[in-house]
């Protein structure tokens, strides 16, 4: 079966995210969110938080947490939900309520319950590449990320800044601009 996922980049600083969990998996999820969107508004709810999870999230002023059981009202005003506990029945309950409310939900280690996945990310300057294996092998995605981090030049930001300046200087209709940009970037393709 083909990978039918649609890759999008979300402005998490304009959305409200709920993470249910406070352990290792929750730390992995929230750190992935905050590494990519340090201004993300995140609320975490869990009956227990690991000390390293608390130490990490306390660096981010827009992240709040509550040490208690999940309540259905925690979904009020949320846009995204991440379930990151070891409590499968709780995940199923949260997913069902989120679906009723048309909220997108990620359930750790349960691809069948996920509306979206947190992909492996490569970032150099303004260049950001998300890698998906359709939930089949996060380990492979991490290996591909490491490869891309190594082969993408460190000066890629300078290249992008130059291309942006060139694009902004172009006159004419959209098709003429695309043609000019394709011409100047054709040398950037990698061929064996």
Regions found by a protein language model. Name each.
Residues 24-25, 89, 135:
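Residue-level detector of alpha-helix initiation sites
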Residues 16, 79-80:
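Structural motif
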Residues 80-86, 91-117:
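ADP-ribose/adenylate-binding Rossmann-like module
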Residues 135-192:
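An accessory alpha-helical subdomain
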Residues 58-76:
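Glycine-rich, highly charged phosphate/nucleotide-binding loops
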Residues 1-56:
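Hydrophobic, well-ordered beta-alpha structural blocks that scaffold small-molecule cofactor pockets
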Residues 107-157:
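E1/E1-like adenylate-forming module used to activate ubiquitin-like modifiers
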Residues 46, 65-69, 109:
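Short loop/edge segments at beta-strand edges and connector loops
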């Amino acid at each position: 079966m083909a990978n039918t996922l649609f890759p999008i980049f979300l402005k998490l600083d304009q959305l409200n995210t709920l993470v249910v969990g406070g352990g290792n998996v929750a730390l992995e999820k929230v750190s992935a969110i905050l590494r990519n969107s340090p201004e993300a508004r995140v609320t975490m709810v869990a009956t227990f938080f690991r000390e390293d999870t608390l130490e990490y999230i306390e660096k981010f002023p827009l992240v709040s947490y509550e040490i208690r059981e999940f309540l259905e009202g925690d979904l009020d005003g949320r846009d995204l939900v991440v379930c990151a506990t070891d409590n499968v029945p709780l995940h199923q309950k949260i997913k069902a309520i989120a679906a009723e409310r048309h909220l997108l939900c990620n359930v750790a280690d349960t691809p069948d319950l996920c509306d979206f996945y947190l992909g492996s990310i490569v970032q150099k300057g303004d260049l950001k590449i998300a890698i998906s294996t359709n939930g089949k092998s996060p380990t492979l995605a991490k290996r591909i990320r490491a490869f891309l981090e190594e082969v993408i030049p460190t000066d890629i930001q300078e290249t992008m800044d130059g291309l942006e300046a060139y694009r902004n200087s172009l006159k004419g209709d959209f098709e003429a601009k695309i043609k000019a940009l394709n011409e100047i970037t054709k040398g950037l393709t990698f061929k064996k």
